[in-house]
Amino acid sequence: MSLEKNLYLASLLDLYGPLLSATQRQVMEDYLLKDLTITEIGQNHDVSRQAVKDAISKAEAKLQMYENKLGFLKRLNGER
C-alpha cells in the first residue's frame, strides 16, 4: 500500500474508527498504525489471512462510505 493511501486511511480511521466494529477497528489499527503484516495480524487474532484481508477490505469500504456521506476529512483539509 502506498504511503499516501496509508495516511489517508489512518486519517479516516482516526475520524470514523469508533463507527467500525471492535474487530475491524483493531485490525485496521494493527495494519495501518502498528504496521503489522496480514500474517501477523491473523496470528494475533487467531484467524486466517483471508479473514484479515476481508476485515481490512470491509473496514476500508466503511471508512470511505462514512467520508463520502459526512465529509469530515475534506472539511478538515479545507476542501469543498
Question: Model features per residue range: what roles?
Answer:
Residues 1-7, 11:
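Acidic, proline/glycine-rich intrinsically disordered inter-domain spacer in sigma factors
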Residues 22-34:
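Short amphipathic alpha helix immediately N-terminal
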Residues 27, 40-42, 52:
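Hydrophobic positions on the alpha-helical face of helix-turn-helix-like DNA-binding modules
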Residues 60-67:
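C-terminal flanking helix
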Residues 69-80:
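Intrinsically disordered, low-complexity basic tails/linkers immediately adjacent to helix-turn-helix/homeobox/MYB/SANT
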